[in-house]
Swiss-Prot record:
It is found in: Cytoplasm; Nucleus. Component of the eukaryotic translation initiation factor 3 (eIF-3) complex, which is composed of 13 subunits: eif3a, eif3b, eif3c, eif3d, eif3e, eif3f, eif3g, eif3h, eif3i, eif3j, eif3k, eif3l and eif3m. Coiled coil: none annotated. This is Eukaryotic translation initiation factor 3 subunit E-A. GO terms for molecular function: translation initiation factor activity. It comes from the Eukaryota. Keywords: Cytoplasm, Initiation factor, Nucleus, Protein biosynthesis.
Length: 446
């Protein structure tokens, strides 16, 4: 299913360390030639300090060849650099291991006050922060993500937002937590990084767009693993104009993930309202990006073409199974997609043949009847089944005019506030901001 694989597009907006899990997934799925994937891993590893990993990949790629001297020499260099940085950082680490320092860090919110305390009690100096940052970055490049996260936490607590490495340290901390699969910590870091980007009033519009595009792609790891992720992705991607603009301008392929989050959302009332807004975006962007997942929504809610929707749903299954971020959503997606087909069909027909419905849902009549019974039992459907005639008779579920007005206007206040905020930010924009440049981010993935 390489036709719909987005790994190459997504990798352009990821740090190279974040690409490795995607390549491992592709290797398991056997979508691409294994030899090509190993070459890709080796290329990615060339600009990292994960030399042992590179040697393992080289052995798998060239089992009959000796490990190149260049890799052996690089390993010697990396070990020497690590020892040097460890000796430089040892007195700094001892300061943070002190119980009194730990208590002070937990109780003090002000980084300047904490720095002054450390300077007074332990002779802490400004250059220690640069050493700590270099050591954290080196640990990250070696693949020691837990060490990197720990030292970057210390660094973040102490440096002001104006520090030249402050923004990079946030990117590094987020990447480290993602790679350790610490989703609670990663969600906190993602929120912190987003606030930093959104509140930076001195960046150019192009720099802000670039930063948000990176954040959108990195956030996929968090949103599709954190329990509240599918709610948060809708809020950020669909209802934050700056991020929706970034998706429409730079990465319309992200609509696949937004659409999946909407379809698999467990809040039925919210899902129905969100679907209306999503359909508008999918229609607007259909000329720049489409895949079976976005086309399923278009077939069902724009064209009301149930046969095409059923066909696209079968294609969606193949797309989901082979997508690193979405494979865990497969069951929820298929279940809710069938419900969407059913609900839309029921709005048009008051009385429906179970046989016809089974055909539309790609189920046997017995499976379809059991499925509908479960919907009625779980209060997700106002309907009755006539078993003799094999019909489903829909209940009267009319919405009052007052409720219709409330549904149509309840999001206007929020959108007006966001519009006002964006106008204020544009008026105060100046000329400077740093682009995300953590660890091995380079032109190859930028």
């Amino acid at each position: 299913m390489a036709e719909y694989d987005l790994t190459t597009k997504i990798a352009h907006f990821l740090d190279r360390h974040l690409v490795f899990p995607l390549l491992e997934f592709l290797s398991v799925k056997e979508i691409y030639n294994e030899h090509e994937l190993l070459h890709g891993k080796l290329d990615l590893l060339s600009d990292t300090n994960m030399v042992d990993f590179a040697m393992d990949v080289y052995r798998n790629l060239f089992p009959d060849k000796e490990i190149p001297n260049s890799l052996r020499e690089k390993r010697t260099t990396v070990v020497a650099q690590l020892k040097q940085l460890q000796s430089e950082t040892e007195p700094i680490v001892k300061v943070f291991e002190d119980p009194e320092t730990t208590r002070q860090m937990q109780s003090t919110r002000d980084g300047r006050m904490l720095f002054d305390y450390l300077a007074d009690k332990h002779g802490f100096r400004q250059e220690y922060l640069d050493t700590l940052y270099r050591y954290a970055k080196f640990q990250y490049e070696c693949g020691n993500y837990s060490g990197a996260a720990e030292y970057l936490y210390f660094f973040r607590v102490l440096v002001p937002a104006t520090d030249r490495n402050a923004l990079n340290s946030l990117w590094g901390k987020l990447a480290s937590e993602i790679l350790m699969q610490n989703w609670e910590a990663a969600m906190e870091d993602l929120t912190r990084l987003r606030e930093t980007i959104d509140n930076n009033t001195v960046s150019s519009p192009l720099q802000s767009l670039q930063q948000r595009t990176w954040l959108i792609h990195w956030s996929l790891f968090v949103f599709f693993n954190h329990p509240k992720g599918r709610d948060n992705i809708i809020e950020l991607f669909l209802y934050q104009p700056q991020y929706l603009n970034a998706i429409q301008t730079m990465c319309p392929h992200i609509l696949r993930y937004l659409t999946t989050a909407v379809i698999t959302n467990k809040d039925v009332r919210k899902r129905r309202q969100v679907l209306k807004d999503l359909v508008k975006v999918i229609q607007q962007e259909s000329y720049t990006y489409k895949d079976p997942i976005t086309e399923f929504v278009e077939c069902l809610y724009v064209n009301f073409d149930f046969d095409s929707a059923q066909k696209k749903l079968r294609e969606c299954e193949a797309v989901l199974v082979n997508d690193f971020f979405l494979v865990a959503c497969l069951e929820d997606f298929i279940e809710n997609a069938r419900l969407f087909i059913f609900e839309t069909f029921c709005r048009i027909h008051q009385c429906i043949s179970i046989g016809m419905l089974a055909d539309k849902l790609n189920m046997t009549p017995e499976e379809a009847e059991r499925w509908i019974v479960n919907l009625i039992r779980n209060a997700r459907l106002d309907a009755k089944i006539d078993s003799k005639l094999g019909h489903v008779v829909m209940g009267n579920n009319a919405i009052s005019p007052y409720q219709q007005v409330i549904e149509k206007t309840k999001s206007l206040s929020f959108r007006s506030q966001m519009l006002a905020m964006n106008i204020e930010k544009k008026q105060s924009n100046a000329n400077r901001n740093e682009t995300p440049n953590w660890a091995a981010q380079d032109a190859g993935f930028y």
